[in-house]
Amino acid sequence: MNKSFEIGTLLLRVITGIIFFVHGLSKFQGMEGTIQFFGSIGLPSFMAYVIAAIELIGGVLVFFGLATRIVGVLFALTLIGAIITVKLKAPFMGNAEFDYLLLLTSIHLALTGSRFLALDPFVFKGKKNGNVSA
């Protein structure tokens, strides 16, 4: 991969990690409201904890370049669920565009990983590529 691509992917990785971390933190800080919202769209209350944990922990992992591809898949699945359950009723209203962009960045990270300034090579030294992110 060329350096420009890696720098661009690094920027996507870092901002995506921050966004998901903040959203997960917000869900945990207002868990009662999060559970109520999940119930209002027909999801069981435990899913509020699952989604909040994926966003919070996944955000930290992606920010530091740990398991970027795996977390990218989890983020993409979470966003697909959100788009189907909430956003499809008004596909270009209510900040749905933001979810579409996050879905695309998550898919990009799942497909390409992110090697530049990532911690994967140090944590997963025995892996084939030395990096589960790429």
UniProtKB/Swiss-Prot annotation:
Induction of synthesis: Strongly induced by catechol, less strongly by 2-methylhydroquinone (2-MHQ) but only weakly by chromanon (6-brom-2-vinyl-chroman-4-on).
A biological process from GO: catabolic process
Keywords from the named record: Aromatic hydrocarbons catabolism, Cell membrane, Detoxification, Membrane, Oxidoreductase, Transmembrane, Transmembrane helix
EC number annotated for this UniProt entry: 1.-.-.-
Taxonomic superkingdom: Bacteria
Keyword Transmembrane: yes
CC per GO annotation: plasma membrane
Annotated localization: Cell membrane
Topology of this chain in the membrane: Multi-pass membrane protein
Enzyme class at the top of the EC tree: oxidoreductase
An annotated Gene Ontology molecular function: oxidoreductase activity
Segments traversing the membrane: 5-25, 46-66, 70-90, 91-111
Family as reported in the entry's similarity comment: Belongs to the DoxX family.
Function text: Essential for growth and viability in the presence of catechol and probably involved in the detoxification of catechol.
UniProt-recorded name of the protein: Putative oxidoreductase CatD
Organism: Bacillus subtilis (strain 168)
Lineage of the organism: Bacteria, Bacillati, Bacillota, Bacilli, Bacillales
